[in-house]
Amino acid sequence: MTSSRLWFSLLLAAAFAGRATALWPWPQNFQTSDQRYVLYPNNFQFQYDVSSAAQPGCSVLDEAFQRYRDLLFGSGSWPRPYLTGKRHTLEKNVLVVSVVTPGCNQLPTLESVENYTLTINDDQCLLLSETVWGALRGLETFSQLVWKSAEGTFFINKTEIEDFPRFPHRGLLLDTSRHYLPLSSILDTLDVMAYNKLNVFHWHLVDDPSFPYESFTFPELMRKGSYNPVTHIYTAQDVKEVIEYARLRGIRVLAEFDTPGHTLSWGPGIPGLLTPCYSGSEPSGTFGPVNPSLNNTYEFMSTFFLEVSSVFPDFYLHLGGDEVDFTCWKSNPEIQDFMRKKGFGEDFKQLESFYIQTLLDIVSSYGKGYVVWQEVFDNKVKIQPDTIIQVWREDIPVNYMKELELVTKAGFRALLSAPWYLNRISYGPDWKDFYIVEPLAFEGTPEQKALVIGGEACMWGEYVDNTNLVPRLWPRAGAVAERLWSNKLTSDLTFAYERLSHFRCELLRRGVQAQPLNVGFCEQEFEQT
């Protein structure tokens, strides 16, 4: 798509300001007009095309049809609108959906195709996609195109959209260790992710404060590592529900079990797993990272990750590897002896590398791929060529753009998170800081830039729990969502502000308590109940 065509579509959208063009994220190709069609809520239908590979019984689309019908019109009945003058009615009051390839019972993957086209004119109202995942994205766009007049009539404008994501991995991280998030909060977050066309839920499940995951192989991990083994855990059924709920919205679940650091919550449940710290020649009574010198450590990891590999069906697991503090390892005489025998000298990065390489081999043997934090790359751990490196540090050891350059120059795929830590808040419209980030603004060849597969907004939990999660996430995470979905040239802040403000109001209408971007109001505030 040429830049002139993009800017023409932006100008056209500005000319028809309002619900008909307040789309978020912005499509790749968009044409519209002021010609509009009436929708009648009482008998509006989503319908499979006769030639569609997906037909009634397709769980992904059957449930999406009901979900979006409720979002558009609610579950009640509507009086037939009183219309004056000539009005066009949407063809048969139906959106026809056609999917080229089957896949209703599958899981989304990194390679899933999410392209779709949406045509609304005098002759047809058609959503065409290669896959059910593209159809989901198109249904979200359709839902945002429908608008209601002050008199209560539903309209949709004549529209032609051709759309696809810029990056295949568009994620959101939730930290459920530092503060436990109820299952309902996670499911609600998945809903809003789908509204924003985000497609990866990065589930950070282990950290020092708590471990809420219920392991059936090592139940003591949860019993002794969670805040409360009854109320603050995720059961096997909870995990299954999250995975299926996400699947029905075209969202992958990327589970993170971070080691060897960030694992103090595992210590009580698995005696001997963590490294005893020493003060001089005596144990201090405190513990550090996982002990990499013991065979028992790797036996535990083999068994635990065999379980995890079966519970979480996505091809990838996130294995962490960040912020390993060597202080405790340095103090421990058994660790020192192990390093001498291995020929590591006093280079604790070699010890870390030994542990992580062994863990990666274990996970690979289960047919899994893996994502790691950037320290694994920075510390020169020997990793497989298909490893995905997540860049999270803004300027240590180098600026994050330089880090992307180095990671991709080495031939690894990369994810960007460094500028998108949503748990960090400031006064004013900080969404703009997230929005203006250009993920490919580093020096590198086209081949290097093709290795950046997307990014993630991160919501770490030190100061975030169920009471403030939603307004801190939304609509700020939407700025990241558009940056990862839309064309690079969709970058005008004024245009973004108008649409994001409207989208925030739409989120409120859908029951999401998204915070305001600035002074103003939402039109639904004036409606009398």
UniProtKB/Swiss-Prot annotation:
Effect seen on changing W420C: In GM2G1; infantile; inactive protein
Regulation: Addition of GM2A stimulates the hydrolysis of sulfated glycosphingolipid SM2 and the ganglioside GM2.
Positions annotated as propeptide: 23-88
Outcome of substituting L484Q: In GM2G1; infantile
Annotated localization: Lysosome
Post-translation changes: N-linked glycan at Asn-115 consists of Man(3)-GlcNAc(2). N-linked glycan at Asn-157 consists of either GlcNAc or GlcNAc(2)-Man(7-9). N-linked glycan at Asn-295 consists of either GlcNAc, GlcNAc-Fuc, or GlcNAc(2)-Man(4).
Mutagenesis or variant effect for G250D: In GM2G1; juvenile
Mutagenesis or variant effect for H204R: In GM2G1; infantile
Catalytic-site annotation from UniProt: E323
EC class (word): hydrolase
Disulfide bond found in the keyword field: yes
Keyword entries, A-Z: Disease variant, Disulfide bond, Gangliosidosis, Glycoprotein, Glycosidase, Hydrolase, Lipid metabolism, Lysosome, Neurodegeneration, Signal, Zymogen
GO cellular component: azurophil granule; beta-N-acetylhexosaminidase complex; cytosol; extracellular exosome; intracellular membrane-bounded organelle; lysosomal lumen; lysosome; membrane
GO molecular function: acetylglucosaminyltransferase activity; beta-N-acetylhexosaminidase activity; protein heterodimerization activity
Outcome of substituting W474C: In GM2G1; subacute
Assembly information from the UniProt record: There are 3 beta-hexosaminidase isozymes: isozyme A (hexosaminidase A) is a heterodimer composed of one subunit alpha and one subunit beta (chain A and B); isozyme B (hexosaminidase B) is a homodimer of two beta subunits (two chains A and B); isozyme S (hexosaminidase S) is a homodimer of two alpha subunits. The composition of the dimer (isozyme A versus isozyme S) has a significant effect on the substrate specificity of the alpha subunit active site.
Protein known as: Beta-hexosaminidase subunit alpha
Gene name for this UniProt entry: HEXA
